[in-house]
Amino acid sequence: MAGKVVMYTDGACKGNPGPGGWGVVLRYGDACKTMHGGELQTTNNRMELMAAIRGLRELKRACQVELYTDSQYVRKGITEWMSGWKRNGWKTSAKKPVKNADLWQELDAETARHTVNWHWVKGHSGHPDNELADELANRGVRELNGA
């Protein structure tokens, strides 16, 4: 397995649903890479998921990943809820279809390639890399509008 990667992810949405963006900060040793993008019609939760997917997809080899998100939806989904969803055919405990199942399945596939430790960080609390991921996600939204 390749080295240790530290990843910060964030999503943003102007309106929910509405135009949204995602941002990723990847750190490997002294190297830092940032990524961002957006979608015209989406939700905040979809952008939070997309940030994690795109960050993990960017890693070319299997890595030990310390992934930080300010989304309890993403962290709890992957660490607590997903095994039940998979067991229930992507249905919730209330027998309803899992929201964003397409992205949860993509995240599951990307996660399988790596050893990922999931961490929650309080958003907008001054952590530099979380703030940068937030800035990148908002840039993804702005660029949709040609700003």
Swiss-Prot record:
Binding positions for Mg(2+) 2 per the UniProt entry: D10, D134
GO cellular component: cytoplasm
Functional summary from the UniProt entry: Endonuclease that specifically degrades the RNA of RNA-DNA hybrids.
UniProt catalytic activity: Endonucleolytic cleavage to 5'-phosphomonoester
Residues that, per the record, bind Mg(2+) 1: D10, E48, D70
HAMAP family in UniProt: RNase_H
Cofactor: Mg(2+)
Major site of localization recorded for this protein: cytoplasm
Name of encoding gene: rnhA
Domain annotation RNase H type-1: ranges: 1-142
Subunit structure: Monomer.
NCBIfam families: PRK00203.1
Subcellular location: Cytoplasm
One record GO biological process: DNA replication, removal of RNA primer
EC assignment: 3.1.26.4
Keywords, comma-separated and alphabetical: Cytoplasm, Endonuclease, Hydrolase, Magnesium, Metal-binding, Nuclease
Family: Belongs to the RNase H family.
Entry annotated with the keyword Membrane: no
Species of provenance: Marinobacter nauticus (strain ATCC 700491 / DSM 11845 / VT8)
The protein's name: Ribonuclease H
Co-factor binding comment: Binds 1 Mg(2+) ion per subunit. May bind a second metal ion at a regulatory site, or after substrate binding.
